[in-house]
C-alpha cells in the first residue's frame, strides 16, 4: 500500500516515514503544498497524511483542489492546530480524518488502517477513470456534480471500457461481451449504444471520452 506524507518539517516527515515503512507501507514525502498537490493528483496513493501549515500552498488549499479534481483519495490532516474551526473547515472541504500533533503512533496507525479499509470497501464496487466512476452495484455513471443511470447494455458496454481503459477494443469483442454470439445487425446497435454513452459522458462533463479507431474498434481515453 502506497502512502504520501506532506509535511514541511523534515524530521517529522522522516519519522512518520520510518514508522510506516516498518509496518510494510511504501511511503513518499513532499515538503510543500505545491509538490504535495502534484503528487496527489497522480492518483497513485492509497492515503495521504497532509499538514495544514505548508509552504507555497496550505493543506486546506491542497485538499480543495484535490476534491475539485474528483479524486477521493483518503486524506488525514496531521497538524499542530487544534482549534475547532480548523478541524471543521478541513472536514467540510472533504478531509476523512484529523489528528493533532503530538500524536500516539498506535493511534495514527489505527486511523490509517480504518480509512484505507473503508476506501477499499468503496472501491470494490466502483471502476474509475479520470473524473468518472462506474458504480457496479447501482449501474450509475457518476461525476462529482451528477450521476446518470445506465441501461443494462449501456452498463455492460461501459464496464468493458472501464476494465480495459486506454486499450483499443475490437468491435466484435465488444459485441460478444454485451450481446453474445452475434450477426452483422448488432454492429449498428453497438454504434447506437456508443452514441448513448458519449452523450451521457458529455452531460457529466467527463474528462474521458470514447475514441473510434476506424475499421477496428473503440477505446476509452482521458482527454489530453
UniProtKB/Swiss-Prot annotation:
Q: Does the keyword Transcription apply?
A: yes
From its record, what is one biological process in GO terms? regulation of DNA-templated transcription
- Highest rank taxon of the organism: Bacteria
Give its localization.
Answer: Cytoplasm
4-aspartylphosphate modification sites? 51
Q: Which cysteines are joined by disulfide bonds?
A: none
* An example Gene Ontology CC term for this record: cytosol
Q: Output the PTM entry.
A: Phosphorylated by DltS.
Q: List, in alphabetical order, the Gene Ontology terms for molecular function in this entry.
A: phosphorelay response regulator activity; transcription cis-regulatory region binding
Task: Outline the extent of the Response regulatory domain.
Answer: 2-116
| InterPro entries to which the protein is assigned, alphabetical | CheY-like_superfamily (IPR011006), OmpR/PhoB-type_DNA-bd (IPR001867), Sig_transdc_resp-reg_receiver (IPR001789), WalR-like (IPR039420), WH-like_DNA-bd_sf (IPR036388)
Could you tell me which residues form the DNA-binding region?
Answer: 124-222
Tell me the Pfam families matching this sequence. Response_reg, Trans_reg_C
**Keyword vocabulary terms for this entry:** Cytoplasm, DNA-binding, Phosphoprotein, Transcription, Transcription regulation, Two-component regulatory system
Purpose of the protein = Member of the two-component regulatory system DltS/DltR. Regulates the expression of the dlt operon.
Q: In its UniProt entry, what is this protein called?
A: Transcriptional regulatory protein DltR
Annotated source species: Streptococcus agalactiae serotype V (strain ATCC BAA-611 / 2603 V/R)
Classification from the root reads: Bacteria, Bacillati, Bacillota, Bacilli, Lactobacillales
Amino acid at each position: 500500500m502506497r502512502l504520501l506524507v506532506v509535511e514541511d518539517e523534515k524530521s517529522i516527515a522522516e519519522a512518520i516515514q520510518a514508522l510506516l515503512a516498518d509496518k510494510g507501507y511504501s511511503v513518499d514525502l513532499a515538503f510543500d503544498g505545491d509538490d504535495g498537490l502534484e503528487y496527489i493528483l497522480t492518483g497513485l496513493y492509497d492515503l495521504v497524511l497532509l499538514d495544514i501549515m505548508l509552504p507555497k500552498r496550505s493543506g486546506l488549499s491542497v485538499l480543495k483542489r484535490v476534491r475539485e479534481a474528483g479524486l477521493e483519495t483518503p486524506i488525514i490532516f496531521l497538524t499542530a492546530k487544534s482549534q475547532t474551526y480548523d478541524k471543521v473547515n478541513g472536514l467540510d472541504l472533504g478531509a476523512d480524518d484529523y489528528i493533532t500533533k503530538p500524536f500516539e503512533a498506535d493511534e495514527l496507525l489505527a486511523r490509517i488502517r480504518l480509512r484505507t479499509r473503508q476506501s477499499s470497501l468503496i472501491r470494490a464496487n466502483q471502476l474509475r477513470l479520470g473524473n468518472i466512476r462506474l458504480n457496479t452495484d447501482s449501474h450509475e455513471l457518476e461525476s462529482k456534480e451528477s450521476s446518470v443511470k445506465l441501461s443494462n447494455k449501456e452498463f455492460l458496454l461501459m464496464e468493458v471500457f472501464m476494465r480495459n481503459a486506454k486499450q483499443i477494443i475490437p468491435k466484435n469483442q465488444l459485441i460478444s461481451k454485451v450481446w453474445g454470439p452475434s450477426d452483422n445487425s448488432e454492429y449498428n446497435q453497438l454504434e447506437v449504444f456508443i452514441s448513448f454513452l458519449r452523450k451521457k459522458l458529455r452531460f457529466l462533463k467527463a474528462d474521458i471520452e470514447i475514441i473510434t479507431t476506424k475499421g477496428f474498434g473503440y477505446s476509452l481515453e482521458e482527454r489530453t
